[in-house]
């Protein structure tokens, strides 16, 4: 009888052990499946985070590219304006330099061609009698056009009245309210003892005072 009870006790203990072992295995399986699900969820969550990060980075890159393009576009028009504005300036400076060089050359030519004022050979005192000048002749001449130029202009003006072949006779200087002026006399070959009187101011403007003057 004791043997039977002992065998029954051992059998029941074995059954209990098997039962516990089965429960442990099923519990371990449940834990494993839960862990796998957590790992999957975590990996999915991480992948979503990575995707969001990539999207954010792409947006930032696009924004930076757009900003750089805008800055480049904003700078280029300014460069164009500067280049455009520089060209006319260079041209105007070049033209100005050319004009200055021409003016200087003209002044040098006039100085090289300078001829001191003179009376014609065997001149009659006509202009000198009309306008005797007792002032500083050199100072007056500095304010007047070149003598040869003034004489040529005055002669052309005199030839517009009467004979066109008048000859130079004499000159004088006359003081005016605004400075000085030349006084020229030109002999008319077609009339006896007749002269044309022409004045020329500082600006080089001639005026026929008397086309038929007889001293």
UniProtKB/Swiss-Prot annotation:
Lipidation (S-diacylglycerol cysteine): 18
Region spans: Disordered: 17-110
UniProt-annotated location(s): Cell membrane
Sites of N-palmitoyl cysteine lipidation: 18
One annotated Gene Ontology cellular component of this protein: plasma membrane
Membrane topology label: Lipid-anchor
Keywords (A to Z) from UniProt: Cell membrane, Lipoprotein, Membrane, Palmitate, Signal
Position of the signal peptide: 1-17
Compositional bias (Basic and acidic residues): 25-62
Biased composition annotated in UniProt, kind: Low complexity: 63-76, 91-110
Disulfide bond is among the record's keywords: no
Superkingdom of origin: Bacteria
Name this polypeptide is given: Uncharacterized lipoprotein SERP1959
Upper classification of the organism: Bacteria, Bacillati, Bacillota, Bacilli, Bacillales
């Amino acid at each position: 009888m004791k043997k039977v009870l002992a065998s029954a006790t051992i059998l029941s203990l074995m059954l209990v052990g098997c039962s516990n072992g089965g429960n442990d295995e099923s519990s371990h399986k449940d834990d494993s499946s839960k862990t796998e699900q957590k790992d999957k969820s975590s990996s999915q969550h991480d992948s979503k985070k990575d995707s969001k990060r990539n999207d954010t980075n792409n947006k930032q890159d696009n924004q930076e590219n757009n900003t750089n393009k805008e800055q480049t576009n904003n700078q280029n028009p300014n460069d164009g304006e500067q280049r455009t504005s520089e060209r006319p300036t260079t041209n105007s400076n070049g033209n100005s330099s050319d004009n200055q060089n021409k003016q200087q050359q003209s002044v040098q030519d006039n100085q090289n061609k300078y001829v001191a004022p003179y009376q014609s050979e065997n001149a009659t005192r006509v202009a000198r009698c009309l306008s005797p000048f007792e002032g500083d002749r050199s100072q007056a001449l500095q304010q007047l056009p070149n003598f040869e130029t003034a004489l040529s202009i005055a002669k052309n003006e005199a030839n517009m009245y009467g004979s066109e072949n008048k000859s130079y006779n004499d000159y004088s200087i006359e003081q005016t309210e605004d400075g000085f002026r030349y006084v020229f006399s030109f002999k008319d070959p077609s009339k006896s003892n007749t002269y044309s009187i022409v004045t020329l101011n500082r600006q080089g403007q001639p005026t026929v005072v008397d086309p038929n003057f007889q001293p």
